Every structure is written in C-alpha cells, then in structure tokens.
Design a protein with these regions (language model features):
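Generic structural motif recognizing short loop/turn segments at the entrances and edges of beta-strands
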Residues: 22-25, 181-183, 211
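FMN-binding flavodoxin-like domain, especially the glycine-rich phosphate-binding loop
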Residues: 2, 7-14, 20-49, 53-174, ...
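Iron-sulfur cluster-binding cysteine motifs and their immediate structural context
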Residues: 186-187, 192-214, 218-220, 224-241
Length: 255
C-alpha cells in the first residue's frame, strides 16, 4: 500500500508510477477520516510526498501520527519529490515513524520540476530543465521500485544539499509558523470564476463565493491553485507577480 499527498501533481505522478511497478494499492491521505486501515501482516507500506521547505508537509506528518493500521507494517519506505534538495527529511521522517513504534527501512528523493512560487527567488524551471527532470525521474522510479522489491534495509538515497540541518530545523519551523497562510491569495480582474482552483485544491480549502475563489484557513502552500488557473488570475501577495505556471500534463506522455 502506498499513501501519498500531492499538491501540483508531481508526487501523485510518482506515486502512480511506483504503484504500477510494485502492484500496490494507492491511497490519498486527504481521503483518510480516522478509520482503521486493514493491511496484511507482511505488507509493505510506502509514503510519497513533496518536500515543502526542506521537510515533509505537515499534513503528511500529521497523517503518520494519526493513521490507524490493523498491523504493524513489516517494511516502510518513503519517496519524496523536490526541486533540488531535501534537507534532513530522512532523519525527520524516520523520527516520526519511530514515534509510532515502527521502523523506516529506506528513503529516496526524486528531483522534479520546481513548483514553489510564493516567495522571492523561487519560481518554476525552464521547460527544457523540467523535461529533463521528468525523464530522469522516470528512470529513477524504475531503480527505486527494484530496490524496494528486494526489501533493501537501512538505505537512504536522498540529496540533502548544503546547510541541511539549518534548512530543516530552522527555516522549516519558520515556514510552518509564518507561511502556511492563504491570506495573501487574491484574484485579479482576469478571474472568470471557472472553479478550477476549487476542484484542484487537494485539501478542499477553496470555495467559490460570488464568482470568485475564497481561501480557508488550512492552506498547505502547495500553490496548486496558482498553477492551474487558466487565466493566471491567482496571485500570492506581491511574490507571484510575473511568475510562470507549471502544469505536469504539458510534459506528458514521455516520448
């Protein structure tokens, strides 16, 4: 079984590819409502998620803390998608798994096109770079699937990058404290009230009121609404002005 969370779509694509190769069931964590999930005694459990500010998204860590499984997983691994580096995600993820009395056996990162646009200095990749990343990701998924099938243990293959401790244990808490807000989101006059942002929000945090999107209080900063808007009418304060959108489907299927 593979539990996944995805905002813009990169992690959903990776999780789908991985599930097909491993013949595993795919479960979106946003559909979890506290029910007992039945797994086999020897079942392998995977977690797939994007990296937000050099750590797993809070929604994924909350899910790990709350999910009720019928048996202790025999084998646990994670695959995270990121624009470049993960910080100390392997260490942080493993600590949350251990807090449940479980053991994480393996972890991987996969570089995917950048999607974060809600801060100065961050933006999407050029199309050529995005395409290269997706091609490389396809090959990496093949490698990861083979290693997971072999039940490889005590194996972490993540690009932590420089200043990993500082990024994960200093910057990320600040990000979670100050940036997980939808308040700066607004729409320009280009908005036509199509509702695609509402349909795309992975945590159902957007409603359409009087023909315009209204954001709730549970934003994860995935920025899916920004990227999906066909009019490019959604902005986040002054940080997204003039920035380009990213949509995975433009680069698929791979040729």
């Amino acid at each position: 079984m593979i539990f996944y969370f995805s905002g813009v779509g990169n992690s959903a694509w990776v999780a789908t590819q991985l599930a097909e190769k491993l013949a595993d069931k795919l479960v979106s964590i946003v559909d979890y409502a506290g029910q007992l999930i039945h797994i086999q005694e020897e079942e392998r459990i995977g977690f797939v998620f994007p990296i937000y500010s050099w750590a797993p998204p809070k929604i994924m860590l909350d899910f790990i803390a709350q999910v009720q499984l019928s048996h202790t997983p025999a084998y646990i691994y994670f695959v995270c998608t990121c624009g470049a580096d993960t910080g100390k995600t392997p260490e942080l993820f493993s600590a949350h798994i251990q807090a449940r009395g479980w053991q994480c056996h393996a972890g991987y990162s996969i570089a995917m096109p950048n999607t974060y646009v809600a801060f100065p200095g961050f933006g999407v990749d050029k199309d050529s770079i995005a395409q290269q990343k997706i091609y490389a990701a396809k090959e990496r998924i093949d490698l990861i699937a083979k290693q997971i099938q072999s039940n490889i243990s005590n194996h972490y293959d993540c690009n932590e990058g420089g200043l990993a401790n500082f990024k994960t244990y200093t910057i990320n808490p600040l990000f979670c404290q100050h940036m997980l807000s939808a308040n700066p989101f607004y729409t320009t006059d280009a908005c036509v009230g199509c509702g695609k942002c509402q349909e795309t929000c992975p945590i159902h945090n957007i409603t359409i009121e009087n023909g315009r999107p209204s954001w709730g209080e549970h934003c994860t900063q995935c920025t899916a609404c920004f990227h999906i808007c066909p009019q490019n009418a959604i902005q986040y304060g002054r940080f997204t002005k003039g920035k380009k959108q990213y949509q995975l489907h433009r680069f698929l299927p791979l040729k």
